[in-house]
């Protein structure tokens, strides 16, 4: 399983979310981190344009934008943004 890091923007939004939704998003991100290939998950899609190189995870009406990083030889998952569909892009 890859370690998961949250950018300060994602942490700020997580603090304001209802507790049940926060747990749902964190569980979904943890599930993606455990996968060998995140794109094999049905709710993950590669993004283009401004977010080129990033992936999107759909969790109900929320979206989490993340990318994979190499950290001292190990791959980790960094969550950049979390929010409702209309605001996160």
For each predicted feature, which ranges?
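Alpha-helix boundary/capping and short turn/kink residues
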Residues: 19-22, 37
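A short, surface-exposed loop/turn module that caps and links secondary-structure elements
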Residues: 31-56
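N-terminal alpha-helical segment
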Residues: 6-7, 40
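Short strand-loop junctions, especially beta-strand C-caps/beta-turns
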Residues: 9-11, 50
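Enriched for short, Lys/Arg-rich terminal
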Residues: 1, 8, 15-16, 23, ...
């Amino acid at each position: 399983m890859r370690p998961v890091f949250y950018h300060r923007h994602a942490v700020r939004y997580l603090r304001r979310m209802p507790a049940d939704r926060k747990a749902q998003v964190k569980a979904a991100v943890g599930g993606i981190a455990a996968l060998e290939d995140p794109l094999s998950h049905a709710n993950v899609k590669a993004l283009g344009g401004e977010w080129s190189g990033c992936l999107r995870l759909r969790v109900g009406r929320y979206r989490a934008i993340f990318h994979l990083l190499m950290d001292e030889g190990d791959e980790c998952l960094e969550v950049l943004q979390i929010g409702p569909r209309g605001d996160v892009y």
